[in-house]
Structures are given as C-alpha cells and as structure tokens.
Amino acid sequence: TMIPPLAYIATPQEMDEMLTSEKPKLALDNFWLERTGSIERSKELIRIYYNRTLFSNYYFTSYKAGWLTDRGMVYIMYGPPDKVYKNAEGESWGYKRPPVKSRWGSRYTYEDQYLWFNFRKQKSLFSDNDFVLNRAGTPVSYWDIAVARWREGKVFRLDNPQELR
C-alpha cells in the first residue's frame, strides 16, 4: 500500500490512524491535503514522494523493500544525490549545500560543499544489494528540517539556503 512509506514523515499516531482506517485511501489523501491545503499541490507532492519510493524499490531492494533500506530512506527524503562514488566496500552520496562565500584579500570565492552519506556494503546470504548507512559519519544531516519541510507540504532541497533555516 501507499501508507507504510510515509513512516519517514508521519507521526506514529498518524500512521496508526491511516493503517487502521476503514477508508485508508481517504485517510491517505487527507494526510497530504493537511500538509498542503490544496488538491493540486497534494498531487504534486504525492507524485514526487511516491516516484522516489518507486525508484527506491527498483534500485535498492535487497532482502527487504527498497524504501525500507537506508539508501531508500535517504533517497526518498533528499532526492537523487548530486555525486555518487562507489567501490567494493560501499557507496558515498553527496548532496550539494549552498555555496560558502569566503573572502581572500579583495576577492570573493565560492566553495561548493556537500553533505555526504556513506553506505557500507553488507555481506548477506540473501542479497548482494544490502548497504547500511554509517550514521556516525554524517554528524549534520538536516534530517529534522527535511521532515519538517515535507510535513509543511514542501519538497526538501538541500541546495536551497532558505531550507536550512
């Protein structure tokens, strides 16, 4: 169903209400309408959120559905990464942050900075597509801000400076 992937942005109470509702589709629609206040905006948010979920299921499924994996979680919340590095041990995903303006003498320079998520490949009898997020390696992830933006009916974008306030 479409309700379980909302676990990243819905409260436990909201999840319980939607999952136990006699009319789950109506409960799901109301969840999105409460976020946006507009049918058109809700449709757009639903399209983006569930396209990311579909992509996660297609590319990141291991012994569990892709949206339940660490890579799926990050992809759903942050979208496609700006940079990806892969090796035998794992993957690193980089999301571009707003450029930092620094002054050197009379010149200003802009430096690109990235938020990195590092995934370590797990050995598994059941799948060769199982990766675990190194949570200690990402001290600032803006997770709470990302959740808040989705709950406000907005798609979170890390490269937008207004998003980080």
Residue ranges and their predicted role:
Residues 1-165:
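Residues within mature, well-folded domains
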